[in-house]
């Protein structure tokens, strides 16, 4: 069962539809780092990252990773660590995963740019939102919808961004 982004603000899985937000500049086939677009394509869901100091009870079949204070996601296209989970390092550009604003209390890593091609986009996740504000390229859901989505995904679920 796949998750499909239909229209620009509806995520659908099975018979469930959830309002969501996407990149501020819409959907684009050839994503470029920093373009504020959500990448078009079909992507495997990888790991579920979560803040265990805030979230303890949830159902999910994906591999889970506890977010720690020193975790980041490298968004420096010139680094060999580009589009990878890293231990925060002052010499690298990164997206911090341990945040105060609750947007990353839960996030699902998708396999966009898994070959780590420089400038092809990094840190594309399904994560939380409070107000459906446009993202830098991710897909964002309200927490209650995210938790329902987690119950529905399987190890074979893909995300289709059309």
Q: Where do the model's predicted regions map?
A:
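Cell wall/extracellular polymer interaction/catalysis modules
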Residues: 1-136, 143-162
């Amino acid at each position: 069962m796949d998750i499909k982004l239909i229209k620009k603000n509806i995520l659908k899985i099975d018979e469930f539809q959830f309002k969501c937000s996407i990149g501020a500049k819409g959907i684009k086939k050839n994503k470029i780092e920093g373009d504020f677009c959500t990448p078009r394509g079909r992507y495997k869901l990888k790991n579920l990252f979560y803040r265990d100091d805030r979230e303890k009870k949830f159902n999910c079949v994906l591999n889970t990773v506890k977010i720690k204070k020193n975790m980041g996601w490298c968004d420096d296209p010139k680094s060999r660590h580009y589009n990878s989970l890293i231990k925060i390092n002052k010499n690298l550009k990164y997206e911090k995963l341990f945040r105060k604003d609750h947007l990353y209390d839960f996030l699902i890593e998708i396999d966009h740019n898994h070959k780590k091609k420089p400038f092809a986009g990094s840190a594309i996740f399904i994560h939380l939102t409070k107000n459906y504000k446009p993202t830098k390229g991710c897909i964002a859901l309200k927490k209650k919808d995210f938790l329902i989505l987690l119950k529905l995904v399987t190890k074979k679920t893909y995300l289709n961004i059309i």
